[in-house]
Amino acid sequence: MILNSSTEDSIKRIQDDCPKAGRHNYIFVMIPTLYSIIFVVGIFGNSLVVIVIYFYMKLKTVASVFLLNLALADLCFLLTLPLWAVYTAMEYRWPFGNYLCKIASASVSFNLYASVFLLTCLSIDRYLAIVHPMKSRLRRTMLVAKVTCIIIWLLAGLASLPTIIHRNVFFIENTNITVCAFHYESQNSTLPVGLGLTKNILGFLFPFLIILTSYTLIWKALKKAYEIQKNKPRNDDIFKIIMAIVLFFFFSWVPHQIFTFLDVLIQLGIIHDCKIADIVDTAMPITICLAYFNNCLNPLFYGFLGKKFKKYFLQLLKYIPPKAKSHSSLSTKMSTLSYRPSENGSSSTKKSAPCTEVE
């Protein structure tokens, strides 16, 4: 969608140079359906994650704090998803007013940054817990985890401020519809560049590099531990899990980030072809479904790596109430071996200790 401003009114009036871009009947049916599925699955799954972690597991570990906040961030986003489903089903006609336009848009942006930052911190926590279990004891505390989550929520809110400021309701004169969209004045070309690059770099590239580095180091440490303890059979599931975590994150977000970058080029007028604009506007909601559906499954995905999480989750599904006493924290297959150098410089392996527990 290429928008040009014409007149100013209570609702700003603009022109769309490519009015048919992204407007296909199958999009107006398929995307609301996918949004509805994401909403139902996401609300159900993330609500159960919150209940399991808070009431059954008693929020005892650092990783459980990150997972709880991840689920809460997803729930905040999911609550606005029906608005986007209606918006798309109405062929991109926004009936909810300017305030809800800003709030719903900011929720999408907030969830992107909060979830990515939390996953990044979770990967760092896994690295410290598995590779440096003894050294990281004093740093991996509940207080540090809670303060980190507060900082993440503040940073995600700060990163979403431009969306609150610049996302508005506009009336497109040549199509006679009201949309909730970004609109950039031609002379203010630095804004879309800044927003697009922030989303690409801060919302994907840097976090992915940190996640990739963390799990690569975990991979190497566990591999070395198995080589040292040759009499112990190698559990390849550990390495499959690590590979799945990295690939899951990468392929969930790469399509959306690519089309976000192309959309910035269109908004800047670098790309003028309406055929390309149609491809981008058609693909964008599909990539959003992919990214945010996987995003909403993350708490379940990470949680089910832990045996105790699975146990309590199944208990909850069977309506078995949590016991009054506190439960010990989650552990996963990645915590069956921890690796650390001994004091004399040689390498040693040991069975998992509480400091290596993943959730």
Swiss-Prot record:
A lipid is attached at residue 355 (S-palmitoyl cysteine). The chain crosses the membrane at residues 26-55, 62-89, 99-125, 142-165, 191-216, 240-268, 279-304. Gene3D superfamilies: Rhodopsin 7-helix transmembrane proteins. InterPro entries: ATII_AT1_rcpt, ATII_rcpt, CCR1-9-like, GPCR_Rhodpsn, GPCR_Rhodpsn_7TM. Residues 326-359 are annotated as: Disordered. Signal peptide: none annotated. Angiotensin II binds at residues 15, 17, 167, 182-184, 199. It comes from the Eukaryota. Pfam families: 7tm_1. Residues 1-25, 90-98, 166-190, 269-278 are extracellular. Residues 56-61, 126-141, 217-239, 305-359 are cytoplasmic. It is found in: Cell membrane. Keywords: Cell membrane, Disulfide bond, G-protein coupled receptor, Glycoprotein, Lipoprotein, Membrane, Palmitate, Phosphoprotein, Receptor, Transducer, Transmembrane, Transmembrane helix. One of its GO terms (molecular function) is angiotensin type I receptor activity. GO terms for cellular component: plasma membrane. Residues 327-351 have a biased composition (Polar residues). Disulfide bonds join 18-274, 101-180. Interacts with MAS1. Interacts with ARRB1. Interacts with FLNA (via filamin repeat 21); increases PKA-mediated phosphorylation of FLNA. PANTHER family: CELL ADHESION MOLECULE, TYPE-1 ANGIOTENSIN II RECEPTOR A. This is Type-1 angiotensin II receptor. It comes from Sus scrofa (Pig).
